[in-house]
Regions:
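Short, well-formed alpha-helical segments that are part of the catalytic scaffolds
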Residues: 11-25
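A conserved acidic beta->alpha catalytic loop
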Residues: 21, 38-47, 92
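Glycine-rich, basic loop-to-helix element that forms the pyrophosphate-binding segment
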Residues: 64-80, 101
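Short aromatic/hydrophobic "clamp" motif used to bind/position activated sugar donors
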Residues: 85
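Conserved donor NDP-sugar-binding/catalytic core segment of glycosyltransferases
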Residues: 97-131
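Short, flexible, basic/aromatic active-site loop/helix in glycosyltransferases
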Residues: 117, 134-155
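Acidic donor-binding loop at a coil-to-helix junction in glycosyltransferase catalytic cores
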Residues: 157, 181-194
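Non-catalytic, C-terminal membrane-associated alpha-helical segments of glycosyltransferases
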Residues: 228-232, 246-315
């Protein structure tokens, strides 16, 4: 059996398109469950999902009041009955063979503990030419057309569509924090990948388990959207370094902060003279995110959450 965990927050329009692709899987319905985790939505998500329960016996509605994708995914993982977990975003279209292909990768190599899946961007309208180099930043993932395995840290997982054995997920403490209230403070699913890489876990690649990630050009494919991704990545990078230092503001952290502040000042001036240089502008946003993390550390309520090594086993 395999469990699909779908966090959602006010994403009803996307969920209406995405959820039917999970009902259309080639696996028999008794061999998989779909757990929709409602993360405090104020739209009609609950009514929509509950209206489907009588027809789809493998569908489960779960409410998670603590905001953040990490918290929603963890709630779903605790609820899951299966040996294998699949984490999927609510704004994707998934091919009918998706779950069967993930299981095929596990069954072909019993040492495999996690599976990366193909993710492609599906734009609502034609995207601008300049966006091409940044598709990986938006989650596009492709390691080729053949099933492969790697334990040399060459494969990454993306929370849009990924799988992991439940026992491994629990042993490693799940995902790292991402949101605390309105604040992004951690590295979420990337932090979990780093845990797998730290022990050179065997990760499989399922090229035929596919997600088409529905994206809006006006939002995700805009210069502001890419800049926000870079800014958030900067916060996540600083969190990862802080975690590596055992959550101590030691000399390494202070040196990192000072260097990042100097880079921000330098690149800010450069951007004034090169306002159309997107690469330079996005790099500035990432370094600003690096610095912003330290401002978040000044908030006592955030600092307590940030310094938890294992947020999965804290209920």
């Amino acid at each position: 059996m395999i469990s699909v965990i779908i966090p959602t927050y006010n994403g009803l329009d996307m969920l209406r398109k995405s959820l039917p692709t999970w009902f259309a899987q080639t696996l028999p319905t008794e061999e998989y469950e779909i757990i929709v985790v409602d993360n405090r939505s104020v739209d009609d998500t609950r009514q929509y999902v509950e209206s489907l329960l009588p027809e789809h016996k493998n569908l489960i509605y779960l409410y998670e009041p603590k905001p953040g994708a990490t918290n929603a995914r963890h709630a779903g993982a605790r609820k899951a009955k299966s040996e294998y977990l699949v984490f999927a975003d609510n704004d994707g279209l998934f091919n009918p063979e998706c779950l069967a292909e993930i299981l095929k990768v596990y069954y072909a190599n019993k040492k495999c503990v996690a599976v990366a899946c193909r993710i492609e961007i599906l734009w609502d309208v034609v995207e601008p030419d300049w966006i091409a180099p940044y598709k990986n930043l938006l989650g596009q993932l492709n390691y080729g057309d053949e099933i492969r395995y790697d334990n040399h840290n060459r494969f990454y997982l993306n929370g849009g569509l990924m799988s992991v054995r439940k026992d491994v997920f629990e042993r490693l403490g799940g995902f790292n924090p991402d949101l605390i209230g309105p604040y992004l403070i951690g590295d979420g699913d990337l932090g979990f990948v780093n845990k797998l890489h730290a022990e050179h876990a065997l990760i499989g690649w399922a090229p035929n388990a596919q997600m088409q990630h529905m994206q809006l050009v006006a939002k995700h494919g805009s210069k502001h959207g890419i800049a926000l991704h870079c800014y958030n990545n900067g916060i996540a990078d600083s969190y990862a370094l802080y975690r590596k230092q055992q959550f101590r503001m030691n000399s390494t952290m202070w040196k990192f902060l000072i260097v990042q502040m100097m880079i921000v000042l330098k690149q800010y001036v450069q951007c004034m003279f090169h306002p159309r240089d997107l690469k330079r502008h996005f790099a500035l946003q990432q370094h600003k995110g690096n610095v912003r993390f330290f401002g978040l550390l000044m908030k006592p309520e955030l600092r307590r959450e940030i310094r938890q090594f294992d947020v999965y086993n804290i209920v």
